């Protein structure tokens, strides 16, 4: 069950997807991330390629992308590896854009879309050979239930790869408040992700600290949006452009000061 704050976040996502698919925003995304999906995660093309290798997927594999948004990186992973793909998300607006993208690119792989919460996946147990999600858990309150649901639908001894932004343990009260202000809306967690993964029956194969590359990505995004500010103002309210710059500056500073981190996990089901 979604909290009221999560419901409000979902409503705002429709506005975000519309904004992210404006031509100038797609141009910025291509320059910074190497893709143009109007993505809601911070996954670059190079990181998506790494995810494909870590998942070990190929033709005949069934991949589940949870919280897939407009289809990045799931559609790209399916296109480059030949695996069959299922995209899951709420609300529907991002999935509609993913469907349009898939229709436009018309690949030979099978792609299914499901409107569902990550904590209540509508699939039978042991349905998938691989699971991925990109910066999803830091945008949800109930992180543990999502990890449990992914465990149930993944086949035994298969892998899940995901990225997540988190707040390091042991911060002072003032630094913790700064981290919450700079991170995604639900970045806070009572437990570390290593603990959450252990609690939900996952074995951690790799935990890659990708904070420095995320810091560089944030700086690149900030610089690129600043350089396109005049173009952005032609299609966007000045207050929105100003707020995005402030948010990027706040996140960059929090990352540089060690108040946020980003990890890429490779985990295996224990069942």
Q: Which stretches of residues belong to each language-model region?
A:
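Conserved Class I S-adenosyl-L-methionine
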Residues: 206-271
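A short SAM/SAH-binding and catalytic strip from SAM-dependent methyltransferases
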Residues: 130-142
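A short acidic, Gly/Pro-enriched loop at the edge of an enzyme's catalytic core
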Residues: 119-131
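N-terminal, positively charged/glycine-rich alpha-helical extensions of SAM-dependent methyltransferases
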Residues: 1-32
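Conserved alpha-helix/loop element of class I SAM-dependent methyltransferases that forms part
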Residues: 41-59
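Short, glycine-/aromatic-enriched active-site segment of Class I SAM-dependent methyltransferases
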Residues: 162-185
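A short glycine-rich, Lys/Arg-flanked "PGG" loop and its adjoining helix->strand segment in the class I
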Residues: 144-159
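Class I SAM-dependent methyltransferase SAM/SAH-binding core
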Residues: 62-120
């Amino acid at each position: 069950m979604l909290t009221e704050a999560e419901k409000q976040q979902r409503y705002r996502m429709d506005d975000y997807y519309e904004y992210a698919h404006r031509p100038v925003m797609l141009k910025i995304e291509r320059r910074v991330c190497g893709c143009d999906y109007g993505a809601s995660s911070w996954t670059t093309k190079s990181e998506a390629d790494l995810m494909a290798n870590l998942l070990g997927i190929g033709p005949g594999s069934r991949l589940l992308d949870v919280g897939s948004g407009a289809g990045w990186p799931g559609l790209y992973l399916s296109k480059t590896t030949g695996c069959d793909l299922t995209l899951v998300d709420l609300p529907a607006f991002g999935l509609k854009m993913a469907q349009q993208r898939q229709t436009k690119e018309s690949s030979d792989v099978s792609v299914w879309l499901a409107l569902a919460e990550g904590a209540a996946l509508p699939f039978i147990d042991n349905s998938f050979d691989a699971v991925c999600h990109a910066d999803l858990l830091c945008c949800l309150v109930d992180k543990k239930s999502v990890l449990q649901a992914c465990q149930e639908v993944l086949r035994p001894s298969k892998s899940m790869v995901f990225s997540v932004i988190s707040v390091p343990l042991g911060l002072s009260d003032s630094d913790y408040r700064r981290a919450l202000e700079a991170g995604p809306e639900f970045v806070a967690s009572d437990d570390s992700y290593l603990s959450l993964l252990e609690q939900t029956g996952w074995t951690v194969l790799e935990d890659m600290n990708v904070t420095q590359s995320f810091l560089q990505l944030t700086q690149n995004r900030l610089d690129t949006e600043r350089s396109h500010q005049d173009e952005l103002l032609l299609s966007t309210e000045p207050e929105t452009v100003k707020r995005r710059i402030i948010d990027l500056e706040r996140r960059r500073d929090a990352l540089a000061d060690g108040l946020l981190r980003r990890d890429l996990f490779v985990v295996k089901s224990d069942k």
